From Swiss-Prot:
Binding site for ATP: G38, A39, S40, G41, A42, G43, K44, S45
Subunit structure: The complex is composed of two ATP-binding proteins (MetN), two transmembrane proteins (MetI) and a solute-binding protein (MetQ).
Molecular functions per Gene Ontology: ABC-type D-methionine transporter activity; ATP binding; ATP hydrolysis activity
Signal sequence range: none
Topology of this chain in the membrane: Peripheral membrane protein
Enzyme class at the top of the EC tree: translocase
Domain ABC transporter: 2-241
Identification of the protein by name: Methionine import ATP-binding protein MetN
């Protein structure tokens, strides 16, 4: 549905040349929810704006539903953009128009008959859970409700693609979850292809089928969400995954934790499990194989793309030789082990 090939985007600021995107290629199949994740300044907003040519690529090809957009005339591009809805971080609603009027605007600009506008807007507001807000103004809505209006407006022209530019970044966690569930429901109900950009791996984890990691204007990793969470290939992907799970060291352990080993101490470990290593009885196996005892301090597990992953804080009791052998064995079985210190 979306195929970006060798996209490069260069900005000129006076005598400075800034390369925002460098030879980026991305394929989003029809009906998928595809996430692009990256830190601020990585190029993700520029990338998503190249899809509908809000930013025209310096080089490269943009295919949407089989149509090459970069070669279209302005009138042809305007028509093609009706198939590409877009929502933004800051909603961009017209304060002087009601909820109904905001959603109706693209239909009015397209000279849609009034009775058809009324039918379509009513249908869309019901779909996004705002069936009772026709006559409300944006100033009377919560942030989540404003984004729902923006989603309804983006869907007014029956697009085949929805672009989401940090659509949940301005929302609180509970509202973010409700908006993501709405997008997932719309994707299932309408078969809509969704491309979203975000700096939060939680967003990717909740609704995306595939994910690409962008850094310094380049896609450094892309695969299914389950594969990236199970076998991240880059340090940046690993960092984003770690951000979705966090365990604080209990206060009593922090007081006793030493950086270097001392007499009668035991190592405190942070274990990261992904894919098959989550369900395998690896800690029990280390106890049998290496004569060590594992005391689990705390643990957290989650799912992404149908794959379970998690982290655990443990004490490993045993001789230095046995604990080192057990740690090496865990690492061989795809468990990431970090020695946090000694207690």
């Amino acid at each position: 549905m979306i195929k970006l090939s060798n996209i490069t985007k260069v900005f000129h600021q006076g005598t400075r040349t800034i390369q925002a995107l460098n030879n980026v290629s991305l394929h989003v199949p029809a009906g998928q929810i595809y996430g692009v994740i990256g830190a601020s300044g990585a190029g993700k907003s520029t990338l998503i704006r190249c899809v509908n040519l809000l930013e025209r690529p310096t080089e490269g090809s943009v295919l949407v539903d089989g149509q090459e957009l970069t070669t279209l005339s302005e009138s042809e591009l305007t028509k093609a953009r009706r198939q590409i809805g877009m929502i933004f971080q800051h909603f961009n609603l017209l304060s002087s128009r009601t909820v109904f009027g905001n959603v109706a605007l693209p239909l009015e600009l397209d000279n849609t008959p009034k009775d058809e506008i009324k039918r379509r807007v009513t249908e869309l507001l019901s779909m996004v859970g705002l069936g009772d807000k026709h006559d409300s103004y944006p100033s009377n809505l919560s942030g989540g409700q404003k984004q729902r209006v923006a989603i309804a407006r983006a869907l007014a022209s029956n697009p085949k693609v929805l672009l989401c530019d940090e659509a949940t970044s301005a929302l609180d966690p509970a509202t973010t979850r409700s908006i993501l569930e709405l997008l997932k429901d719309i994707n299932r109900r309408l078969g809509l292809t969704i491309l979203l950009i975000t700096h939060e791996m939680d967003v990717v984890k909740r609704i995306c089928d595939c994910v690409a990691v962008i850094s310094n204007g380049e896609l450094i990793e892309q695969d299914t969400v389950s594969e990236v969470f199970s076998h991240p290939k880059t340090p940046l992907a690993q960092k984003f995954i770690q951000s979705t799970l966090h365990l604080d060291i209990p206060e009593d352990y922090q007081e006793r934790l030493q950086a270097e080993p001392f007499t009668d101490c035991v190592p405190m470990l942070r274990l990261e499990f992904t894919g098959q290593s989550v369900d395998a009885p690896l800690l029990s196996e280390t106890a049998r194989r290496f004569n060590v005892n594992n005391n689990i301090i705390s643990a957290q597990m989650d799912y992404a793309g149908g794959v379970k992953f998690g982290i655990m804080l443990t004490e490993m009791h045993g001789t230095q030789q046995d604990t080192q052998a057990a740690i090496a064995w865990l690492q061989e079985h795809h468990v990431k082990v970090e020695v946090l210190g000694y207690v």
